[in-house]
């Protein structure tokens, strides 16, 4: 008798990805975040779909439609806050997922890593456009400031910005196209995530020791399905706590004021998950230089595999690199804090110092430390 699970064309793909997948026996809870990101994406698509049923992408009614969702639609407030805080959970999982990749040397799996960087950019673009949709003060001015950065591109900058705006300022055409793009991008992200998994399953997962585990693997189900389910329960617990008890904790009060092009908020800032990049952008006095630094702050991940001279893949047994990794984490937290502060001293100088440290660690200090560690181990 043939086993349907192993022979059916569709079931076979699911079976080889989530059931009979040979997995290293020693991967820790930090490997849970891939499945949690899948769960976050699912939550965002479902809640987003229900929100789109009631939302109107028009400058005159967008703000009122969000108010209508929260006040008049059955459990509309729950869906809205699940979607808003779900984005925060998404980025929290993303940052831990990337951090785990850096710590354990998962960037050695080049195709998987590069698709991951594309995913990161796509999710950031989607989140930015989603923040514009409620059409509050911070939505409008955030959109104005960030899209206006493209005007720093020599020669074509101004034309490019006006083309994106659909006019001479952020307005109805901008909101309409942002809604269309915000709706379609999660499906593109889903496709990229599948390619990400495809490449991962070509090579197999990395593990905390960074050694080949081909001689000793266990099936994904029931071991890691159970483990992932526990992670999912904890994620839902955190998301529901945030949504039901502190729904506005991570939001900006300015976004409860309808967008007004004639009144600039005293301090324009994006959501918390973009603050580190925003701080790097602001720390450079030159506009074009700031934009380049902003893009490089993420794109630098793409050159990490070529800046890694260590003979050991993971940082598990490299205390100097471990120390620098946690310095990098502290630096990113500092940048996040600075991004939310006004542009005045001492915040300017702290931001500039933290930005220099960020790039120095990534490009120079960490690779040099790898060479020192190799030398100490006489490799």
Curated annotation (Swiss-Prot):
This is Cytochrome b. It is a multi-pass membrane protein. Component of the ubiquinol-cytochrome c reductase complex (complex III or cytochrome b-c1 complex) that is part of the mitochondrial respiratory chain. The b-c1 complex mediates electron transfer from ubiquinol to cytochrome c. Contributes to the generation of a proton gradient across the mitochondrial membrane that is then used for ATP synthesis. It holds the Pfam family Cytochrome_B. It comes from Lepilemur randrianasoloi. The cytochrome bc1 complex contains 11 subunits: 3 respiratory subunits (MT-CYB, CYC1 and UQCRFS1), 2 core proteins (UQCRC1 and UQCRC2) and 6 low-molecular weight proteins (UQCRH/QCR6, UQCRB/QCR7, UQCRQ/QCR8, UQCR10/QCR9, UQCR11/QCR10 and a cleavage product of UQCRFS1). This cytochrome bc1 complex then forms a dimer. Its cofactor is heme b. It is found in: Mitochondrion inner membrane. GO terms for molecular function: metal ion binding; ubiquinol-cytochrome-c reductase activity. Binds 2 heme b groups non-covalently. The keyword Metal-binding applies. Heme 1 (or BL or b562) is low-potential and absorbs at about 562 nm, and heme 2 (or BH or b566) is high-potential and absorbs at about 566 nm. Coiled coil: none annotated. Heme b b562 binds at residues 83, 182. The chain crosses the membrane at residues 33-53, 77-98, 113-133, 178-198, 226-246, 288-308, 320-340, 347-367. Belongs to the cytochrome b family.
